[in-house]
């Protein structure tokens, strides 16, 4: 009996060849699950922090006391990791877009990555500048490969601490401190904000970090800053140069989710919790190893 395989049947009219699209691309010989992003360029990269505490009156958005603590905390932590940190306060939408455009058209050839933080109110797929809202995808889109060639294949990290300023902005007075006084200007009040910023995909090598997942609440203390940024900065201080970054973000999720409002004068705020989230389009492991001097 012949061992030869039977001849292939000729395709009839209208029949298409069964071929996967990936066959058109060269295959990698070795797939390394431990592969890391190259983080030994001349410089770490730029970290932009857009901080918004006050807003144009016509937007009817409340101020965000405590956000300057977030800004300063982030500036210290990212500087420690080797970033060139640039902070901007209460920019108008046109000014903010100009700064983003300048960053996207700058050369990042000798940089490891790019990082951008927004501290503001948010709604849907927008965040608020001083005088208008801006679509998040408008901002991230400027850093995609066709717009920003020098960041192709490099991590692009966006951190969004955005909470909705509406009827859910309930001041919560912590009563678990013996000497707490609500009539002092420095009282550290907690504000409970409804989550309303959608998690949006951005593209390959993007990492989108959100202070709160949809359906939960975002908390910001008027003196110490937001829960999310407080815990993010604590984890960056402890593990920023040693732990893989998405693993660090998972620790942040855990720490924030363990917080709760236990004692307050508003009974509706008791038990409110917060769960951050991140959407990773990274293709390799991300480590902020110390830069050599």
UniProtKB/Swiss-Prot annotation:
Modified residues (Phosphoserine): 79, 257
Lipid-acceptor residues (S-palmitoyl cysteine): 264, 277
Top-rank taxon: Eukaryota
Residues covered by region (Disordered): 1-20
Post-translational modifications: Phosphorylated by NUAK1; phosphorylation inhibits self-activation. Phosphorylation at Ser-257 by AMP-activated protein kinase (PRKAA1 or PRKAA2) inhibits autocleavage, preventing caspase activation, thereby preventing hepatocyte apoptosis. Palmitoylation by ZDHHC17 blocks dimerization and subsequent activation, leading to inhibit the cysteine protease activity.
Localisation per UniProt entry: Cytoplasm; Nucleus
InterPro entries the record matches: Caspase-like_dom_sf (IPR029030), Caspase_cys_AS (IPR033139), Caspase_his_AS (IPR016129), Pept_C14 (IPR002398), Pept_C14_caspase (IPR011600), Pept_C14_p10 (IPR002138), Pept_C14_p20 (IPR001309), Pept_C14A (IPR015917)
An individual GO BP term: protein autoprocessing
Domain commentary: The N-terminal disordered prodomain is required to prevent self-activation.
Record-given protein name: Caspase-6
Organism (species): Bos taurus
Gene that specifies this protein: CASP6
């Amino acid at each position: 009996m012949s061992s030869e395989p039977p001849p292939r049947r000729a395709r009839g009219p209208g029949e298409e060849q069964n071929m996967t699209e990936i066959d058109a691309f060269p295959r990698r010989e070795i797939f390394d699950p431990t592969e890391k992003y190259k983080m030994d360029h001349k410089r770490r990269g730029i970290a932009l922090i857009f901080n918004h505490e006050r807003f144009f009156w016509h937007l009817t958005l409340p101020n965000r006391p405590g956000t300057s603590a977030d800004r300063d905390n982030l500036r210290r932590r990212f500087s420690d990791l080797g970033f060139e940190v640039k902070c901007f306060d209460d920019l108008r939408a046109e000014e903010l877009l100009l700064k983003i455009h300048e960053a996207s058209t700058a050369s990042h050839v000798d940089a490891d990555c790019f990082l951008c933080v927004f501290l503001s109110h948010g709604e849907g797929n927008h965040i608020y500048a001083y005088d208008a809202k801006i679509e998040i995808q408008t901002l991230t889109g400027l850093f995609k490969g066709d717009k920003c060639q020098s960041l192709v294949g490099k991590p692009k990290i966006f951190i969004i601490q955005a909470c909705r300023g509406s009827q859910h902005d309930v001041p919560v007075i912590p009563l678990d401190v013996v000497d707490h006084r609500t009539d002092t200007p420095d009282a550290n009040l907690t504000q409970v904000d409804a989550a309303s910023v959608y998690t949006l995909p951005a593209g390959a090598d993007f990492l989108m970090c959100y202070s709160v997942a949809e359906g939960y609440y975002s908390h910001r203390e008027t003196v110490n800053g937001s829960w999310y940024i407080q815990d993010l900065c604590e984890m960056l201080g402890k593990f920023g140069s040693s732990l893989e970054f998405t693993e660090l973000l998972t620790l942040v999720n855990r720490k924030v989710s363990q917080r709760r409002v236990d004692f307050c004068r508003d009974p509706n705020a008791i038990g409110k919790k917060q769960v951050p989230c991140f959407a990773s389009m990274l293709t390799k492991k991300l480590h902020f190893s110390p830069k050599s001097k």
